[in-house]
Regions:
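TRNA-recognition modules of translation machinery and tRNA-sensing kinases, especially anticodon-binding
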Residues: 27, 135-434
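N-terminal alpha-helical targeting/anchoring segments
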Residues: 1-140, 154, 158
């Protein structure tokens, strides 16, 4: 959500930003917001004037009542003024109701206006216009065929999607044996990796209130992702970023405690409605998965430096497991409405001979802070909005696809990189059972 002051002072900037995001249908929202804001400010001003006048009249009544002890004729004037006060009270009640209604309407409109993107963001309508920035590691071209990832897992008796389908439907899985252990090893390694980077490890709530959902994401994203608990003001999180940023809702953060750097583990639950949907055969796009996440709450002037650090952490993590990756800059049309700048880290798939997304790093500026009413108290006592950022550390089982394909050997075994061996009981290799 953008600053109303910015919209008042530079509506053309907001309109141009909407065009850059190829959301021309939202252009009328600018005028609608300005009209609602003007009407609300007018109601506030009139109400303030009435309160001032009412206070003056009340004071006058007190003075006249004192005078009426000696001059009873003053009581007639008192009654006349009381009638004015009553009339003004009725009008004030109307104005206060208007203020409430106008503020609510304005808030809903402002939630729909996208955040101002960074000038460095490439302009394009959708993810087809995303720009490759840099590659890390040489893409592998094996001299033997790479099976589909579920076939690799099945060779270790490591997955049962048929049973999961009977129990829960499409988009669920059972991981077992060495594959389940590998899944947990990756999460444990990612946790320790981020702790070594100075982040505080946290296990957050896996369900959040509706006002937190509204604070961290757009309505369209919520509809496509979130599961609501029937009869409760609770939603299952789609990523622990939601509850981690939500931790600061309605809070005043002392500036000296910034940056807040947290890394969190959680299960994640997603409807996956939209263009992609659920993958029928595999575990790339599913309803339930586990993830290690990182978030940063920082001073506005530090957010771009943190953005650079955070996506590079992802690269370092994947390269430590011998997985080639690349950074892909997200174009304007591919950015969610709250994002200022974002990039994907994509892992190399030897089977498909192409990259696929495994991490997403985003700078959201002060959008989430404004929605959640997060504030920082500076050294001078003044309040300001912090910036928030988030990035995937690792999200198995999707990450396992990249891991298994890049570490698969011609005999069907999978090598375990040195960094994961302590988490796998010292194993250096997984041997297929089939």
């Amino acid at each position: 959500m953008i600053d109303m002051k910015l919209l008042r002072e530079n509506p053309d900037l907001v309109r141009e930003n909407i065009r850059k995001k190829f959301q021309d249908a939202k252009l009328p929202l600018v005028d609608e917001a300005l009209e609602l804001d003007a009407a609300n400010r007018k109601a506030i001003a009139e109400a303030s004037e009435l309160r001032t006048n009412r206070n003056a009249l009340s004071k006058k009544i007190g003075q006249l009542m004192g005078q009426a002890k000696k001059d009873p004729s003053k009581l007639e004037e008192v009654e006349a003024i009381k009638a004015q006060v009553t009339a003004q009270a009725d009008r004030l009640a109307e104005l206060e109701q208007q203020e409430t209604e106008l503020a609510e309407k304005l808030h809903k409109v402002m939630l729909l206006i996208p955040n101002i993107i960074d000038p460095s963001v490439p302009i394009g309508p959708d993810d087809s216009a995303n720009v490759e920035v840099e590659r890390f590691g040489e893409p592998k071209v094996p001299d033997f065929p790479i099976p589909y990832h579920t076939e690799i897992m099945e060779s270790f008796d490591g997955i049962d999607m048929d049973a999961a389908g009977r129990v829960s439907g499409n988009g669920f899985y059972y991981l077992m044996g060495d594959i389940a252990r590998l899944h947990e090893a990756v999460l444990a390694y990612a946790r320790d990796f981020m702790i070594d980077k100075g982040f505080i490890f946290c296990i957050p709530p896996f369900m959040i209130h509706g006002n937190v959902v509204e604070g961290v994401m757009s309505q369209s994203d919520m509809d496509a992702m979130m599961y609501k608990i029937e009869g409760e003001d609770l939603y299952l999180i789609g990523t622990s970023e939601h509850s981690m940023i939500g931790k600061f809702i309605d809070q005043i953060i002392p500036e000296e405690t910034l940056p807040q750097t947290l890394t969190s583990y959680s299960p994640c639950f997603r409807k996956e409605k939209g263009a992609h949907g659920i993958e029928e055969r595999g575990v790339y796009r599913i309803h339930q998965f586990e993830k290690q996440e990182m978030i940063v709450v920082c001073k506005p002037e530090d957010s771009m430096a943190w953005y650079e650090k955070m996506w590079r952490f992802s690269v370092e993590l994947f390269r430590s497991m011998d997985i080639p990756v690349r950074q892909l800059e997200c174009c304007s049309g591919d950015l969610a409405d709250l994002k200022v700048k974002s990039c994907d880290i994509e892992a190399w798939s030897p089977r498909q001979q192409k990259y696929f997304e495994v991490c997403s790093c985003s700078n959201l500026g002060d959008a989430q802070a404004r929605r959640l009413k997060m504030r920082v108290r500076g050294a001078d006592g003044k309040m300001y909005l912090p910036h928030t950022l988030n990035n995937t550390v690792v999200a198995p089982p999707r990450m396992l696809i990249a891991f298994l394909e890049n570490n698969l050997q011609a005999d069907g075994s999978v090598t375990i990189p040195a960094v994961l061996q302590p988490y796998m009981g010292g194993k250096t290799r997984l041997e297929p059972k089939k």
